[in-house]
């Protein structure tokens, strides 16, 4: 089968090569179609995404991407947001769990974050009323709320999860977040075997850093989902172990959600774990459950052993050496 591979910026090319090597070692038979995208490509070509990229994703329905840089305060819109809206990948799925061998404050984190991916403030509707007033539109629709809440409960049912918590600020944004919360409660009534509750976003952040094990599945509008995704990654060792899937009706885009790390780009220092774990998510969704399980087990065993690991978790190994160690375990 064919799948699109977008290395992205900074360390992206190095960790994308790790994917190619692991894919070959697992005999997946995937034919990778590689396309450039990101700030570096834009500086060279004047285009954010290489010609043919979107058509290729549309044709095969599967893509895996590395980090792409986005300028702060000005310049082009996030490529991630553009891809999500272009292909209506309405659900962002982030799996967060404690990894043996990675030092953290908690040893029992096991969370799933389901983030609405297409609207909210990320719709990009903002404008200047005059030189001193900027306005942004928080767009929330009932169909999108229902779709993401149903996705969260379906995921919980399929994967043996016991509780789904809605994240909101409906005490202040009574119409927009109020619509999200009321829709969540309507959908929850259809899943009586799954516990359902809700938590205000600021209170949730406090509870996550105090006792994260009290949560199971979190479902949130776009902005809150973005914030708590990184917060939860910090609970288990950082974005170096944060794979993500963007799921639509006909397209799935998997990604490493960490930054492009330009300060170590090209130096063989990057930890490829996140993109390899995202690749494992992709294999699982392709029905290659055994290969996905083997890859995850190899990564976890390598990290737990703690000998041949990258600098971000206390080791001295480079990207290539770590990748080869994982392959040896396969």
List the predicted regions and their residue ranges:
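N-terminal beta-loop-helix "entrance" segment that forms/cooperates
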Residues: 30-52, 208
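Flexible, glycine/charged-enriched surface loops at secondary-structure junctions
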Residues: 31-33, 159-168, 191-199, 288-296, ...
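Buried hydrophobic positions in well-ordered alpha/beta secondary-structure cores of metabolic enzymes
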Residues: 9-12, 61, 114, 152, ...
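Glycine-rich phosphate/nucleotide-binding loop
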Residues: 39-42, 89-91, 207-307
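Glycine-rich phosphate/diphosphate-binding loop of Rossmann-like nucleotide-binding domains
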Residues: 4-25, 130-202, 214
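N-terminal glycine-rich phosphate/adenylate-binding segment common to multiple enzyme folds
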Residues: 43-135, 223
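Short glycine-rich or small-residue beta-strand-to-loop segments that form or flank ligand, phosphate
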Residues: 2-8, 63-67, 164-170, 278-284
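Short, glycine-/small-residue-rich phosphate/pyrophosphate-handling segment
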Residues: 99-125, 139-144, 259-292
